């Protein structure tokens, strides 16, 4: 679950996803799932064949900062589609809202997209109808496992970011190279460590275990059998003993670092930037990290599919996609934005927008499901409901 407005995260349990179907993913040399490699049974939702007349309005569920008058007003003038925005604070809230059938589009993260696809809540997309989905979209955001199923695309990329290790360089005087400073019981910064507060954070523990306990056989942090999940929870309980606080509210995370209660822990690049203090540094540790990637997804019950397609195309342009990325604080999906101005180039450099080598180390949030997405067929993996239940045991 992801919190993207300055409110506390809701602790809502998601319905378990029970998947059946063919074997799972193939693996690339970097160990990430091959695009569209997951084969599972999902509802047969039709794809739009051709565009028609715009309906006059479009209802969108989005993260704060993704739908703003600075670009939505121009869209309305251009298309005649009035934009009605509903800001959501968590992925769970987005899933619930999309299941009402009242919204046409959602800016879904990877920890929501598989739930929406499996529930038949979103429709596959006809990419031929979206002109701005082209060669300028960064390769690392095309055909990803969290929004591409059975060879069909369900999402139009918006932006991405890594869950980085942030530290106070006046206290942590040597740049950390490992997550061990945040996970090990003997960390010299025990009692000054901050951790993310959500079930999906179990994947962060799994990433660390992939490097430190290879005998567990974890090859994808979102594909954990019961033994692997138990190991991740044990590590999280160990970390609980050295954590000063957990954060879901970005404002609280910034305050914790700025006030000195925290000196090291999980962060986003935009949060470090918002501290406006050069003593706060960040690093992507050698073990890699988790991360998030957002995409527009179309409701299977949309009353305004033409306006929705128009919005996905409009916001996919270099200028508008870049405006969204700069407004929120993330790497844009459209690399052409990086060449539009010196300011754009600086933004892209700060957020590693076109650095695929950087993002190859990032495991983007993906909904855990019972079918093992690492390709194993001889074991059942744990699903998001099990992760949610397990997370509740971490903090006691």
Label for each model-derived stretch:
Residues 299-368:
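Mature extracytoplasmic/periplasmic domains
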Residues 61, 66-68, 107-256:
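Extracytoplasmic ligand-binding site segments that recognize negatively charged/polar headgroups
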Residues 36-116:
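Early extracytoplasmic/lumenal segment of secretory-pathway proteins
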Residues 112-117, 265-279:
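A ligand-binding cleft/hinge motif common to bilobed small-molecule-binding domains
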Residues 131-135, 233-239, 277-300:
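Periplasmic-binding protein-like
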Residues 361-396:
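Conserved C-terminal helix/tail region of periplasmic/extracytoplasmic solute-binding proteins
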Residues 19-32:
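Bacterial lipoprotein signal-peptidase II cleavage site
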Residues 166-171, 207-209, 292-305, 323-327:
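A bilobed periplasmic-binding-protein/Venus flytrap-type ligand-binding module shared by bacterial periplasmic
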């Amino acid at each position: 679950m992801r919190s993207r407005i300055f409110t506390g995260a809701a602790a809502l349990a998601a319905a378990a996803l029970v998947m059946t179907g063919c074997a799972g993913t193939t693996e690339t040399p970097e160990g990430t799932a091959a695009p569209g490699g997951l084969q599972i049974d999902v509802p047969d939702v039709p794809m739009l064949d051709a565009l028609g007349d715009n309906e006059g309005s479009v209802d969108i569920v989005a993260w704060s900062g993704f739908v703003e008058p600075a670009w939505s007003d121009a869209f309305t003038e251009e298309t005649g589609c009035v934009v009605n925005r509903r800001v959501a604070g968590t992925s769970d809230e987005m899933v619930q809202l999309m299941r009402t059938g009242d919204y046409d589009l959602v800016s879904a993260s990877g920890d929501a997209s598989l739930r929406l696809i499996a529930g038949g809540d979103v429709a596959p997309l006809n990419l031929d109808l979206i002109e701005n989905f082209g060669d300028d979209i960064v390769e690392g955001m095309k055909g990803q496992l969290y929004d591409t199923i059975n060879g069909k695309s369900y999402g139009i990329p918006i932006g991405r970011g890594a869950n980085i290790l942030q530290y106070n360089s006046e206290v942590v005087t040597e740049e950390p190279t490992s997550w061990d400073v945040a996970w090990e019981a003997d960390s010299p910064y025990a009692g000054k460590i901050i951790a993310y507060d959500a079930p999906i954070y179990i994947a962060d523990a799994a990433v660390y275990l992939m490097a430190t306990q290879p005998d567990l056989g974890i090859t994808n942090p979102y594909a954990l059998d019961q033994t692997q999940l138990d190991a991740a929870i044990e590590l999280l309980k160990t970390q609980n003993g050295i954590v000063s606080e957990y954060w879901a509210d970005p404002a609280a995370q910034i305050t914790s670092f700025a006030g000195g209660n925290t000196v090291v822990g999980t962060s986003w690049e935009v949060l470090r930037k918002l501290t406006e203090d050069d003593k706060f540094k960040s690093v992507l540790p050698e073990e890699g990290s988790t991360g998030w990637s957002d995409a527009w997804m179309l409701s299977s019950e949309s009353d305004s599919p033409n306006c929705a397609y128009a919005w996905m195309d409009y916001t996919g342009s270099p200028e508008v996609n870049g405006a969204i990325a700069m407004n929120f604080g993330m790497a844009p999906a459209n690399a052409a934005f990086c060449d539009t101005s010196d300011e754009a180039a600086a933004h892209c450099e700060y957020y590693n927008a076109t650095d695929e080598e950087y993002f190859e180390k990032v495991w983007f949030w993906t909904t855990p499901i019972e079918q093992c997405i690492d390709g194993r067929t001889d074991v059942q993996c744990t699903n998001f409901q099990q992760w949610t239940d397990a997370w509740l045991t971490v903090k006691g």
